[in-house]
Each structure stands twice: as C-alpha cells, then as structure tokens.
From Swiss-Prot:
Keyword annotations: Cytoplasm, Methylation, Protein biosynthesis
The organism's taxonomic lineage, starting at the top: Bacteria, Pseudomonadati, Pseudomonadota, Gammaproteobacteria, Vibrionales
Principal location: cytoplasm
Protein name: Peptide chain release factor 1
Molecular function GO labels: translation release factor activity, codon specific
Gene Ontology cellular component annotations, sorted alphabetically: cytoplasm
Family statement: Belongs to the prokaryotic/mitochondrial release factor family.
Gene field: prfA
Organism: Vibrio atlanticus (strain LGP32) (Vibrio splendidus (strain Mel32))
Disulfide bonds listed in the record: none
Recorded coiled-coil stretches: none
Amino acid sequence: MKASILIKLETLVERYEEVQHLLGDPDVLGNQDKFRALSKEYSQLEEVTGCFKSYQQAQEDLEAAEEMANEDDAEMREMAQEEIKDAKANIERLTDELQILLIPKDPNDERNCFLEIRAGAGGDEAGIFAGNLFRMYSKFAEKKGWRVEVMSSNVSEQGGFKEMIAKISGDAVYGTMKFESGGHRVQRVPETESQGRVHTSACTVAVMPEIPEADLPEIKAGDLKIDTFRASGAGGQHVNTTDSAIRITHLPTGTVVECQDERSQHKNKAKAMAVLAARIVQAEEERRAAAISDTRRNLLGSGDRSDRIRTYNYPQGRVSDHRINLTIYRLNEVLEGDMQSLLDPVLQEHQADQLAALAEHN
C-alpha cells in the first residue's frame, strides 16, 4: 500500500480516537447538536478504523511468520509458509476493502430520489415501455422495502405513460438508483404488429436526489410562471372539475414541471416545487461534474438523457448495459424487479474508476 494512503489512514485512526474521547466529554453530552454530529462522524470512521487495525494485525502476522520461516525445524518452516500465504491473502483482501472505504462518499447517496421516465421515439409503443420501466422500478423498490409515491403522471392512450415522475423513499435510494439515468431502448414485436416485425422504441430516465429543505436553492417568486388547468386522463378527457393541476415554469432555466395527480391544487403545487428544486440542483451539479471530468469516463453520464445506457431485447430475453459491455439473459427476472445483477457491476466499475482517480491523486 502506498505510503500516502497509510498516512491518511493513520490520521483517520487518530481522529476516530479523538472523537471517541470527545463523546465522553460532559460539555459535548450537554450539547445535543454537537453530540449528534460527533456520533455521526464516529460511526463513519468506525468501519475504516476497524479495517485498518485488522490490516495492521495482518502485517504483524506476516512478519512473525517470516521470522518463523527461518527456524531450523522443518515442520515449523512448513507451518510458517502456510501462515505467510494466509497473511498475504488477508493483506490483499483488506487492502482492497480499505481502498473502497477511502473513496469519497457522495453526500446524496443516502437520500431519497425522484425518478422521471419519459416516452421517447416509438409512439404508443414507447409509452407502453415507459409503463414497463415504471413497473420494473416499483417492483425493485418493493423488494428493497422502499416506498414509491407518484408525483405526476401523463397517461398514454394505449397504456403506459407519456411521462411519469415518482418519489422513492428509503435507505440509500439515490446511491442505488443514480446509475439508471440515461436512454433505455426496447426491441420487441408490438401487440399491434401483424407482420411479426421487431420494432425499436426508447424512453429516457432521470434520477435526481431529493434536496433537504435546508439545502434548497432560493427560487424567487418572480422567476416562476405558474399556470393552473384541469387534470386530464388518457385521451384528454377531464378527470377533475376544478383547475387543480399545476404547471410551473422556472423562467431563468426554462425548466417546466407539471403535477396533476392530487385533487388539491395546493398539494400539486408543493409536489411540483419539490421536483423543480431537484431538477435545478441536479442541472447545476451536472454542469459542474462535466467541467471537472471532461477527460475521465463518467458512468453517471454526461447529463444528456439521450445517452443510451441499456437495451431490453424481448425476442432474445436479453438485457445489455452499453456502458460496461454487460449482457445478461434474464430479461423476465429484471422486469419483475430483480435488478441487482445489473446494478452491482455498474457500481463496481464506478468504484474502480474512483480508485484509479484516488491512485493518481496520491
């Protein structure tokens, strides 16, 4: 392991011990805000500190085994070789674990997220596919014990959605879902296709972290254009007799959000404002990330929702992730929400990229 990384780890252990001491300080115990902040820092440092102490112990075990390998007794030397082998394997495993623990954490990873799905090229079939994607994500959320709340939906005439916006709440939702942003393509024979030809349709998916109230950007009332209209269902029929639906336009950025799922105009406005704030913050973060990572591959995408990330091929039962050249033949399981076999390899590739950046920096 590089000396610079060892120094960083030793500094973290020192801070861990300092925080441990502070948590027993009467002044800290009497200040709930400070106690909470230090408790959170303590829990964040605990795993990396424990792992580093195991690494140091493994190094000591290796040194002791190497000394034993110089003994005159042949049986002792043989035993020492086994211990050297075990210690080296342990050191290698712990080194990998420590490097992953040192990767800078995305502060958004623990947050809830907004999921946007929009039908793209392909007409009615794209709308049906948008419905398939929403069902897939809903099933996945159910398996994870998360809660899905529809914020806004625009139903397609033939089923599915022209647009669907949902909020997903639970543990580490954004960190799990963030790599889903991008273009999703489907290849299948539509039910209306009499010749049995395979058609290609597409949807775009955007995943944005929910912004805590304290971190919300200041949005001036003068920068907003708010329109009210009657909520409509499929085919344009009005499903509400009052103008409860809301359309908010953020004039400086041109961002538009509609919400019509609640009967109350007030609730629709609150939902639309939450999505608008998330979109504005996400757009700013994407611009900043693009400026920083022009020369580095970014699995989170360029911010261009048309970036094709995945293809779902029904005739072959195949799902392909184009970012990491991954293909699996488990389409039915994936559509039923069994997505971990798709998500884990992308996360691992992302961590490998971050480790490469960490190595360059150190």
